[in-house]
Amino acid sequence: MRILGIDVGNKTIGVALSDPLGFTAQGITTIRRKNEEEDIKELKELCEKYEVDTIVCGLPKNMNGTIGFQSEKVLGFCEVIKQNINVPIKMWDERLTTVTANRAMLEADLSRKKRKKLVDKVAATYILQGYLNSI
């Protein structure tokens, strides 16, 4: 059982992968978004390479729990994933994962440049680990 966690942003998609037993998550890459077709192609290749059987996508809800503009964009992209990749998708509340990821990297004393490069992948790891802890 391999689960792929994704943090979908406007410019990048952070990607994390579970271990085969589904206990831990680790960041594997950050996809630089080009266009929908290319983004789906890269995700599909990752799903095939790692034999993924579920995708967990972070849903950026507002602090009061409502669905906002960014959430609508993510939900729309997840519909495109469903149409092109034959893997079930689970949505996971991702409120504050990017803030938490940045805080953890600050505590690790990473430079601003390194944090910027890693933040989406680390956020995807937090999303996936949260999901794994819940199942």
Swiss-Prot record:
One Pfam short name: RuvX
Range of residues in the leader sequence: none
Keywords linked to the UniProt accession: Cytoplasm, Hydrolase, Nuclease, Ribosome biogenesis
GO CC aspect terms: cytosol
Keyword Cytoplasm: yes
Entry's EC annotation: 3.1.-.-
Broad class of the protein's primary localization: cytoplasm
Matching InterPro entries: RNaseH-like_sf, YqgF, YqgF/RNaseH-like_dom, YqgF/RNaseH-like_dom_sf
SMART domains: YqgFc
GO molecular function, one term: nuclease activity
Disulfide bonds: none
GO biological process, one term: rRNA 5'-end processing
Highest taxon in the source lineage: Bacteria
Recorded family membership: Belongs to the YqgF nuclease family.
Family matches, as NCBIfam families: RNAse_H_YqgF (TIGR00250)
HAMAP family reported in the protein's UniProt record: Nuclease_YqgF (MF_00651)
Job of this protein: Could be a nuclease involved in processing of the 5'-end of pre-16S rRNA.
PANTHER family associated with the record: POLYNUCLEOTIDYL TRANSFERASE, RIBONUCLEASE H-LIKE SUPERFAMILY PROTEIN
Name assigned to this protein: Putative pre-16S rRNA nuclease
Species this protein is from: Clostridium acetobutylicum (strain ATCC 824 / DSM 792 / JCM 1419 / IAM 19013 / LMG 5710 / NBRC 13948 / NRRL B-527 / VKM B-1787 / 2291 / W)
